[in-house]
Amino acid sequence: MIYELRVYQALPGRMSKLLKRFKDHTVSIWETHGIRPTGFWTTEVGTSNNELTYMLAWESLAERESKWTAFLKDPAWHKARDESERDGPIVANISNQILIPTSFSAMR
């Protein structure tokens, strides 16, 4: 199992729209593609409170490539993204990392 850590930095004043898009659309679209989120977090204390951090679980890099590519091509995703950004972009930056658990990690 590998994990992908993704951090979305929302534009100022746009975090609620980003959270709504994930809650109302993104997660259910992921379900149809077999994408497995393990958790979602917002920053309470840190350098920015405009961040949504989440983690996805993958069996392999090949699975990640296949399922993420299918998600990005999904018309339902394009519609949800376009509607959520009707009055302007909501994301300033996205970063991601592919993580491999250590032998002593609770998540393997």
Stretches with model-predicted labels:
Residues 2, 48-50, 57-76, 101-108:
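Glyoxalase I/VOC metalloenzyme domain signal
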Residues 33-50, 78-108:
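Glycine-rich beta-strand-turn "strand-cap" elements at beta-sheet edges
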Residues 22, 68, 81:
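Short, flexible helix/strand-to-coil boundary loops that buttress conserved ligand/catalytic motifs
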Residues 2-7, 18, 30, 52-58, ...:
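Short, structured motif recognition centered on aromatic/hydrophobic residues
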Residues 17, 77-78:
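A short, polar/proline- and glycine-enriched secondary-structure boundary/capping micro-motif
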Residues 14-40, 72:
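Short amphipathic alpha-helical segments
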